[in-house]
Swiss-Prot record:
Taxonomic source organism: Staphylococcus epidermidis (strain ATCC 35984 / DSM 28319 / BCRC 17069 / CCUG 31568 / BM 3577 / RP62A)
Residues modified to N5-methylglutamine: 233
Key word Transferase present: no
Family: Belongs to the prokaryotic/mitochondrial release factor family.
Post-translational modification: Methylated by PrmC. Methylation increases the termination efficiency of RF1.
Function, in words: Peptide chain release factor 1 directs the termination of translation in response to the peptide chain termination codons UAG and UAA.
Name under which the protein is recorded: Peptide chain release factor 1
GO cellular component: cytoplasm
Keyword list, A-Z: Cytoplasm, Methylation, Protein biosynthesis
Length: 358
């Protein structure tokens, strides 16, 4: 571990030099790239340097204990030694976690797509509930949300809805939401009080940068049309909605807000995210043949969570976490779930680094 930390510290110093190089300062792409890399290493280097300082302090104290016979001084030195011996192992654990390879997409903005699945109108209402939950969670984290495309249900909620979440770390906070979400509750229209089970699927797509996904203009077919609301009525009287088709893959992205220019930009953003997601899924499938993740496969059809309204219970099936606080969670208080899933992922990666042992 310490050899790795020395390499990280050495790279950090190299980046300091690069960032003061005029050739780098005058190259916006290089400056952004090296600045981000340095920022990613900053905490690891800070903790490692603090660790080394405390390690030296402990050695100095041990040397002083061997040289002094003064009772008061010995007592004081022993207290300092004991405190450092307690602190250093905690710092070592922190350094292990800091060395875990970071998901390169963690800091990115995302596109979230929610689709009503089994359960008819109740599934659409639940899709709307999930949309509201994620919007509140995003707001609590200082992220900005914006609807890209929405197909409303006649009885409330959405048949499907996609929206962007913008802000540093959006993907790291929402990536575990990929999969099928199941709700168990009595629908408002149910007179007999029977509990119905419905599902909605969630896809979280990291937004792609131009360098990560290349799209040629000749591979695109762009159509404009009038958008429709619930029940099929026309929302706009002009052809402002945009549909972009990527001809080589057949991937389609649409946006149906009021401005055609904004719709084109939004649809293009979604198209890039979907193509990038296809690329990531292919890579993950190769990786999945070698290992199975504790926090799920990322498969959109995998049931990941159940929301049981009669018992006010939410269960995340990937890590066996059950919380009796459904109302708070549906109000966007997802921190406890996200933190538990993040810890599970970190533990798993740590095992891999240590060849299967913690």
């Amino acid at each position: 571990m310490f050899d790795q930390l020395d390499i990280v510290e050495e790279r950090y110093e190299q980046l300091n030099e690069l960032l003061s190089d005029p050739d780098v300062v005058n190259d916006a792409d290089k400056l952004r790239k090296y600045s981000k890399e340095q920022a990613d290493l900053q905490k690891t280097v800070d903790v490692y340097r603090s660790y080394k300082t405390k390690k030296e302090e402990l050695q100095d104290i041990e040397d002083m204990l061997n040289e002094t016979s003064d009772k008061e001084e010995v007592e004081m030195l022993k207290e300092e030694s004991s405190a450092l011996k307690t602190e250093l192992p905690d710092m070592e654990e922190e350094l292990k976690i800091l060395l875990i390879p970071k998901d390169p997409n963690d800091d990115k903005d995302v596109i979230v797509e929610i689709r009503a699945a089994a359960g008819g109108d109740e599934a659409a209402i639940f899709a709307g509930d999930l949309m509201r939950m994620y919007s509140k969670y995003a707001e609590a984290n200082g992220f900005k949300t914006e609807i890209v495309e929405a197909s409303e249900s006649d009885h409330g909620g959405y048949k499907e809805v996609s929206f962007s979440v913008s802000g540093t770390g959006a993907y790291s906070k929402l990536k575990f939401e990929n999969g099928a979400h199941r709700v168990q509750r009595v629908p408002e229209t149910e007179s007999g009080g029977r509990i119905h089970t419905s599902t909605a699927t969630v896809a979280v797509l990291p937004e792609a940068e131009d360098v990560e996904i290349e799209i040629r203009n000749e591979d695109l077919k762009i159509d404009t049309y009038r958008s429709s609301g619930a029940g099929g009525q026309h929302v706009n009287t002009t052809d402002s909605a945009v549909r972009i088709t990527h001809l080589p893959t057949g991937v389609i992205a649409t946006s149906s807000e009021k401005s055609q220019i904004q719709n084109r930009e939004k649809a293009m953003k979604v198209l890039k995210a979907r193509l990038y997601d296809m690329k990531l899924q292919e890579e993950q499938q190769k990786y999945a043949s070698q290992r199975k993740s504790a926090v799920g496969t990322g498969d959109r059809s995998e049931r990941i969570r159940t929301y049981n309204y009669p018992q006010s219970r939410v269960t995340d099936h990937r890590i066996g976490l059950t919380l009796q606080k459904l109302n708070q969670i549906m109000e966007g208080n997802l921190d406890e779930i996200v933190e538990a899933l993040t810890l599970s992922e970190q533990t798993e990666k740590l095992k891999e680094l240590n060849n299967g042992e913690l």
